[in-house]
Amino acid sequence: MHIDLNSCFATIEQQANRQLRGRPIAVAAYNSPGGCILASSIEAKRLGVKTGMRVQEGKLLCSDLLILEPDPAKYRCVHLQFREIINCYTPEFSPKSIDEFALNLEGCPAFKLGMHEVAKRIKCDIKNAIGDYITVSIGIAPNRFLAKAASVLHKPDGLDEIHAYNFKEIYAGLKLQDLCGIAANSAARLAESGIYTVMDFYNAKASDLIRAFHSIGGYYWYLRLRGWEIDAVDFARKSFGNSYALPKPFWKLEDLLPILQKLTEKMCFRLHTSGFKARGVGVAVRYKTGNFWHKTRLYADFIYKPGDFFTSAFKLLGLAPYKEPVHTLTVFCFGLIKTDTFQPDLFGVEEKNYKLADAVDAINAKWGNFVLGPASILLSKDLVKDRIAFGGVRELT
């Protein structure tokens, strides 16, 4: 089963504020002509306003489009409420993003109710526990891929199933790029092999698909389209990172440091919450001119303290060759290992550092982000706003 919250951020705003209901609204990164639209309400979508558009494009399509800036705390709260509802039916679920969940009910008591009955009850629970304006589209199928495909057949508030008796009819009504994972380049690659429709895709031999994709990925597509589950693998976390698109064209190192500090603190909080430490640190910069630069460093020992990560990131950023206005600044860490493999040093200094970092994290988790932190964070208060990535939900608790 796949559950998709319709028009996520926009619908949550309409649920919270009755005056927004029935109106075309959009949540954008910035309320400026160049701001990117993150979510548009169902009313706005009907007028052609889509995710990824610029605010000025949306207003050309809908002159009375109301633009709101994101409220991440509100969206995280709703996401956690969704988790609580789903957990009542099955512990076997995976948040695919802030607004999507994949569920496996096999072997759970709720499975005896039937998938459609469970879907209807989840919809009802959402109305009662979260809000009557919130709608979800639910897809049911033999595997995750087809369940997601089913969830978008009749948006909003849909409930559809793809099974052995209707899949050909549904495939016939879809375009290749309607399938999650098939973008323009993949569609062009398939066309070179004489595959133009989803039914062509389904009828193709496994060997032909392997040739078309130049990899084993073609065989995986062969299995997906036939209902085999191959996407249930929970790949190990390889890195953590945070990035920020600057609203102002900073280029001096001293102007970028408060932003780098805050990004590093946010990254470390997620790293610690997930129970990891890291050996590698990296910085990436995309400039307004289109230039891109990145640099990494791998250390012999693992790093845990935010201050150590920041020191390393600061040194790397100082090596950037371009003196141009920055568009996006990113800090990331890699070479992860679980903190339960901790080996104490002779004098116990590292153990104290770990405990201090964990204590700061616990205080911030309870009382709010950056209640405790480096003084330089204060300089970035009005520069780095709280943001939430659609896929950044692993660490939410």
Locate predicted features.
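A glycine-rich phosphate-binding loop feature that marks nucleotide/adenosyl-phosphate handling sites
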Residues: 140-144, 225-226, 277-288, 326-337, ...
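C-terminal hydrophobic structural anchor segments
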Residues: 308-366
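Short, hydrophobic beta-strand segments
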Residues: 101-107, 294-297, 340-345
